[in-house]
C-alpha cells in the first residue's frame, strides 16, 4: 500500500484563476530522492561496524542534516562536490562515535561516499504517479521544473525518469545564478515557459524554498506533503496534497473550478 492521498484545499478564492502553467520542484516532489538516499545509506552500513548498529531512521536524519548543510556550500561554490561528499561521511561517522584514528586518513569517508553514490544512482525512481500526472497536465498547461542543485545531476535525473520529454522549461540554480526561495529563479522559469505569475502554480515539498519562494514571486503554491509534516503557521490558505495520485484528484486541486481537469 502507498501513501494515503490527502487533498487539503484552504483558500478557494485563489483557485478561480485560470491556470496556464505548472512548476514543480524535482527532488522529493517528482524524483524520489528520499527513497534513493535511504537505500544508499544501507550500503554505507557495511563500511564500519559502528554504523551498522545505528537505527535506520536516526541514520537518515543525521545524514540529511549534514547533506543539507554541505549542499548549500556546494551551491555557493565554497566546496567542491567531491570534497563535500567526503566531508559528509566524515561528519556522519564522527557524530556516530567512530574513532578519530579510523577517520584520520580519509579512506573510510571516501569509501562510504563511493558506496553511497553507487547505490544512490542504482535506486533512482520517480515519486509514484509523477509521470502520469505530467502526461495528464501536458495537454492543458505549460510545465516546468525549478530545482536547487547542480545542473548535471538534475538533468541526469530528468532524463533517467523520462520527465524531460514532458517539460517546457527547466531552471536549475547552478545555471540560473539564483536559488529558491529567491524570486529571481522563479521569474526565470516564468520567462522560459512563458507564463505570468498569476496564472502559474508551483508544487513542491519544501515549505521554506518552494512555497515561500513561489508566493514571494506572486504565484499560487501547492504544498506536496507526503510525510504529513505539521503545517507551518504562515499562509494557512496554501493548499496541500500528500500524493501525486489519483491524478484526477490532483488535477482538481491544481485547476479548481476550471473544467480542463475533466
Language-model features: locations:
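Asp-based, Mg2+/Mn2+-dependent phosphohydrolase catalytic module
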Residues: 2-22, 34-35, 131, 135, ...
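N-terminal helical cap/lid subdomain that shapes the substrate entry/recognition surface
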Residues: 16-128
Amino acid at each position: 500500500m502507498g501513501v494515503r492521498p490527502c487533498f487539503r484545499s484552504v483558500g478557494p478564492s485563489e483557485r478561480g484563476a485560470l491556470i496556464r502553467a505548472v512548476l514543480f520542484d524535482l527532488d522529493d516532489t517528482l524524483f524520489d530522492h528520499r527513497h534513493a538516499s535511504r537505500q544508499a545509506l544501507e550500503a554505507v552500513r557495511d563500511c564500519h561496524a559502528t554504523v551498522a548498529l545505528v537505527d535506520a531512521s536516526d541514520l537518515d536524519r543525521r545524514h540529511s542534516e549534514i547533506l543539507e548543510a554541505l549542499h548549500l556550500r556546494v551551491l555557493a561554490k565554497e566546496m567542491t562536490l567531491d570534497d563535500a561528499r567526503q566531508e559528509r561521511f566524515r561528519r556522519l561517522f564522527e557524530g556516530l562515535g567512530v574513532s578519530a584514528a579510523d577517520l584520520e586518513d580519509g579512506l573510510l569517508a571516501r569509501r562510504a561516499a563511493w558506496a553511497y553514490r553507487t547505490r544512490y544512482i542504482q535506486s533512482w525512481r520517480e515519486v509514484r504517479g509523477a509521470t502520469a500526472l505530467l502526461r495528464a497536465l501536458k495537454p492543458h498547461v505549460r510545465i516546468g521544473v525549478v530545482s536547487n542543485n547542480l545542473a548535471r545531476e538534475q538533468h541526469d535525473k530528468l532524463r533517467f525518469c523520462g520527465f524531460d520529454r514532458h517539460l517546457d522549461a527547466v531552471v536549475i540554480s547552478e545555471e540560473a545564478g539564483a536559488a529558491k526561495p529567491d524570486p529571481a529563479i522563479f521569474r526565470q522559469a516564468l520567462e522560459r515557459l512563458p507564463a505570468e505569475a498569476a496564472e502559474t502554480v508551483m508544487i513542491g515539498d519544501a515549505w521554506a524554498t518552494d512555497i515561500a519562494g513561489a508566493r514571494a514571486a506572486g504565484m499560487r503554491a501547492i504544498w506536496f506533503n507526503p510525510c504529513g509534516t505539521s503545517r507551518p503557521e504562515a499562509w494557512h490558505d496554501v493548499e496541500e496534497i500528500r500524493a501525486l495520485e489519483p491524478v484526477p484528484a490532483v488535477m482538481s486541486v491544481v485547476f479548481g473550478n476550471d473544467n480542463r481537469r475533466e
